[in-house]
């Protein structure tokens, strides 16, 4: 049996774009041969793709770093470098992807074949053929490739099941799943026999089918992490119907009604929306002594909490071991599923905007100026830094082009307003140059 893993942290890095090339044609009567350097190729993106054959995130336990290949450099004769292929990473259905730094949900992957770009590849740098003008017919300018996006991600698997079984340990959830489906969960006469979620397909006598999940037993304080706690509570979030299994034999000395109230409090504390899901009470172990008496007492206690009799939850007395009452329970569950819509885990406000990593937002601040301890002026800002990394510092014309870009952004004027004088050191990252007023 493969190990079950439902959380993982990974780092992804898209490929860098290939550098543009400075090259010239070797033809008579063409100044300097004419520009002939091609563009660099696009860097590969990192893409998550849903594979319905996967059931766990175990593949990410030892392989946590994923890096796509960079694009090829531009070539002579105006030929572009080859773009790199995207890196496709398979994930199971029900995988939620978060940005580890911001905690923002990037996507919720639930459909087989669904894809999402988690790190976008960098654009290839332009070759010098792109910079030819009537005033400069033979430019010695080419751009470096754009860096690929790099991210730290948190993956969380919430299994896809129509029906979730909840209840205290040893109330018979695993036994119930084993007799109504082909699932083979571990069953034992001790607490927390089930330590991972088990999923089984159920088929009713009328031909309806649905997926049922047996979740590890809950105890008081589970929503705060007591016992197996929130480690597996997440898996009930995708279910549409909850089967609340209760041991009506009270064989372990617990009160069935107190168990019912305690579990519902844990569900509500973990996620208020869990209580919006329709719930069927499964009174299990009815073949045991005193179970009928306990059930009658349970019904009376439950009814006392409701003013409207029609709002009372449905109760189905069963015995998983004796195979009693199962058909009617499954038929009622199928009927309830048929009239219950899916519950949306994340709305548009929860999901991070899917925007190009290097796209300039209208409100994006172009640059910032600060003063270092050594009195150097330090320039920073996403837009400015992107322009810098794409500047080929080995070419004088490229450096001059970058200087013009800084001037156009208002950097020179801003430095003067801050008090910069001729000869002052200006720093971008580790690169330094003198301010010329």
Swiss-Prot record:
Residues 161-338 form the OBG-type G domain. Its cofactor is Mg(2+). Signal peptide: none annotated. GO terms for molecular function: GTP binding; GTPase activity; magnesium ion binding. Mg(2+) binds at residues 174, 194. Residues 2-160 form the Obg domain. GO terms for cellular component: cytoplasm. GO terms for biological process: ribosome biogenesis. The keyword Nucleotide-binding applies. Its EC number is 3.6.5.-. Monomer. This is GTPase Obg. It comes from Streptococcus equi subsp. equi (strain 4047).
